[in-house]
Amino acid sequence: MINIVLFGPPGSGKGTQAKFLEEKFNLKQLSTGDMFRFNLKNQTELGKLAQSYMDQGHLVPDEVTTNMLRDELKKHTGYSGFIFDGYPRTTTQAESLDVILKEDLGQEVKICLSLKVDDEVLVGRLLERGKESGRADDANEEVIRERIVEYYKKTDEVAEHYKAQGKYAEVNGVGEIAEITANLSAEIEKFV
């Protein structure tokens, strides 16, 4: 199986690339955001627990997010692996993912891919996306810059986790979409 952690700051094209990688390698993208929305909307036990923390203005503990992920992995069979999007965000989550994959699937993360894009390019892309989509979080340059800073704060420690395992690669996220996909695929194929 090919299990990939996909990193990319807001506006890096991560969602677009994940779709191409899903098709090419028969993978299932697991997005933390999608998992949260499903559990909250459907009032699952984990969704109610997460909501109780959010209602108090607290971050949802790693354990709750990890349990959502574990449940999600059980739902999807018949794929050649997974693309983890938005998880792990901390070293604790990365270590939990290692354990879950080993215990539940007898697998491991093969590679952590990070799309690299200059901050000014990201800001430009997001402002343009904000005009097209009407998303408030993509319309304010100050908010965009804060999101980018927050992204790097959260992912730096996780990148170090995978670098220490020899499972980390950076790919230029600027250029033609097909070229970026080819570069990501070449990195994945080194581990297949």
PLM features: residue spans?
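Glycine-rich phosphate-binding loop of ATP-dependent small-molecule kinases
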Residues: 1-192
